[in-house]
């Protein structure tokens, strides 16, 4: 078996996690109490969904997941929510006091008290696996727990499970919408360790997803639930090939191989199509070519950056539902002819495709329409650097005046860590600039228009 363990850290990680597990359960026909009427092999057969669920002797399916937060309120919602019987109580770990939006509290003072307990739980889950493939880590880097405890856990996982791949689904601060003043500090400090300790990180940002909800689903005032349901579709499409049998299956380690040209250049953009409301879907059927095109639309990206400002290095298209390889090849060929979608010249092919015959599932009463086919794209584009340069700029404005720094130093951090993390990010921006530059063959037609 190729099991994956999901780790949900902090409020964002947990709430995205709730949406994901709700969707997985619906997709596999698992009831909220973990029973699965359709499962014929009792006691942990070799079914594909056993990559994400372990099975007890009593036929109950338990997610291979850990939820961690430094304060109890969000996890208490899981403990009392609709899926409370799904999880083992030991999988839900909460502390008593929160990280107060402070990276240093999450990473040093409070985080360090809880991290061993988390690793112990993760170890139990890992021992329960026959061939652990890797970890999916969900967190946000704006707050204190997601950024601080998130990076602490990643660092410790690198020590304990050095060879296993780690995929991060990371919510980054949005350009306009902010939930805390010190977001830029937390993000920069956290990205510093994401650079070292994740193999692939998929960037999400709330503002981009708000806009998708508003524009494509006509939701005037999207809530976090709306956002998370959309994110869970993306994550479900990514992991579908691990949980179902398909024609062109994609492994977690395959993402890494196909998307990451250099170890540091591993921050991905994601998009999903079709995002349409039930009213609209009733009247139209979308072809493979149409959904592929809309996945490449800048407005479909789940992070606020414009792929037209950069170049693609690689991209992974995961189709599900009624899709055949012939349609996919035709759609990809069309994309390659478009002038707006530019690839770096050292990566001529750049597409990895996966097909899964399980059609997309929707949450009853959710916003998305039930469709026959969908595509999720994860792409590695140099335009991601925009996300970092925005955060760096905000970081610089505050750090120049050393604003709020005492809160971090008071929790046992050293001021040198700020500048070290900031330099690391400056180097990352430089790396992106270099991979996007034309290779030295004297052909510099594209250099004039590149703006960074």
Curated annotation (Swiss-Prot):
Primary location: cytoplasm
Residue ranges of the region described as Disordered: 430-452
Entries under CDD domains matching the protein: alpha_tubulin (cd02186)
Residues annotated for Mg(2+) binding in this entry: 71
Gene Ontology MF terms in the entry: GTP binding; hydrolase activity; metal ion binding; structural constituent of cytoskeleton
Signal peptide: none
Cofactor(s) essential for the protein: Mg(2+)
Record-level GO cellular component terms: cytoplasm; microtubule
PROSITE patterns per UniProt: TUBULIN (PS00227)
Enzyme class: hydrolase
Post-translational modification: Undergoes a tyrosination/detyrosination cycle, the cyclic removal and re-addition of a C-terminal tyrosine residue by the enzymes tubulin tyrosine carboxypeptidase (TTCP) and tubulin tyrosine ligase (TTL), respectively.
GO biological process: microtubule-based process
InterPro entries: Alpha_tubulin, Tub_FtsZ_C, Tubulin, Tubulin/FtsZ-like_C, Tubulin/FtsZ_2-layer-sand-dom, Tubulin/FtsZ_GTPase_sf, Tubulin_C, Tubulin_CS
Residues where GTP binds: 11, 71, 144-145, 179, 206, 228
Subunit structure: Dimer of alpha and beta chains. A typical microtubule is a hollow water-filled tube with an outer diameter of 25 nm and an inner diameter of 15 nM. Alpha-beta heterodimers associate head-to-tail to form protofilaments running lengthwise along the microtubule wall with the beta-tubulin subunit facing the microtubule plus end conferring a structural polarity. Microtubules usually have 13 protofilaments but different protofilament numbers can be found in some organisms and specialized cells.
Protein name, per record: Tubulin alpha-1 chain
Gene: TUBA1
């Amino acid at each position: 078996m190729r099991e994956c363990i999901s780790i949900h850290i902090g409020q964002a990680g947990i709430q995205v996690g709730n949406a994901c597990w709700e969707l997985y359960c619906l997709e596999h026909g698992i009831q909220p109490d973990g029973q699965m009427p359709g499962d014929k092999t009792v006691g942990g057969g070799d079914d594909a969904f056993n990559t994400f669920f372990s099975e007890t002797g009593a036929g109950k399916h338990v997610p291979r997941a850990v939820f961690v937060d430094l304060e109890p309120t969000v996890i208490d919602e899981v403990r009392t929510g609709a899926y409370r019987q799904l999880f083992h109580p030991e999988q839900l770990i909460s502390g008593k006091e929160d990280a107060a939006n402070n990276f240093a509290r999450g990473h040093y003072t409070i985080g360090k008290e809880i991290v061993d307990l988390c690793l112990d739980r993760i170890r139990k889950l890992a021992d329960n696996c026959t061939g652990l493939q890797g970890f999916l880590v969900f967190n946000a880097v704006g707050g204190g727990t997601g950024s601080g405890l998130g990076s602490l856990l990643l660092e410790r996982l690198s020590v304990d499970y050095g060879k296993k791949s780690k995929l991060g689904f990371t919510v980054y601060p949005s350009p306009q919408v902010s939930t805390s003043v010190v977001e830029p500090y937390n993000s920069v400090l956290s990205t510093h360790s994401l650079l070292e300790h994740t193999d692939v990180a998929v960037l999400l940002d709330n503002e981009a997803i708000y806009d998708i909800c508003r524009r494509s689903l006509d939701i005037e005032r999207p809530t976090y639930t709306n956002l998370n349901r959309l994110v869970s579709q993306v994550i479900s499409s990514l992991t579908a090939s691990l949980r179902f049998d398909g024609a062109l299956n994609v492994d977690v380690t395959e993402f890494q191989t196909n998307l990451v040209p250099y170890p540091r250049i591993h921050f991905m953009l994601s998009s999903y199509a079709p995002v349409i409301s039930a009213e609209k879907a009733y009247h139209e059927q979308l072809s493979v070519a149409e959904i592929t095109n809309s996945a490449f639309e800048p407005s479909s990206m789940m992070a606020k950056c414009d792929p037209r400002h950069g170049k693609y290095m690689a991209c992974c298209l995961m189709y599900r539902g009624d899709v055949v390889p012939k349609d996919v090849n035709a759609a990809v060929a069309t994309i390659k002819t478009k002038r707006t979608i530019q690839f770096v010249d050292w990566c001529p092919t750049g597409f990895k495709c996966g097909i899964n015959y399980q059609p997309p599932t929707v949450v009853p009463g959710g916003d998305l329409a039930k469709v026959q086919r969908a595509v999720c794209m994860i792409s590695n584009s140099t335009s991601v650097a925009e996300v970092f340069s925005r955060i760096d700029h905000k970081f610089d404005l505050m750090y120049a005046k050393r604003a709020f720094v005492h809160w971090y130093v008071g929790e046992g951090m050293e001021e040198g860590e700020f500048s070290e993390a900031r330099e690391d990010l400056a180097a990352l921006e430089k790396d992106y600039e270099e991979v996007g530059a034309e290779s030295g063959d004297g052909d510099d037609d594209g250099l004039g228009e590149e703006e960074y």
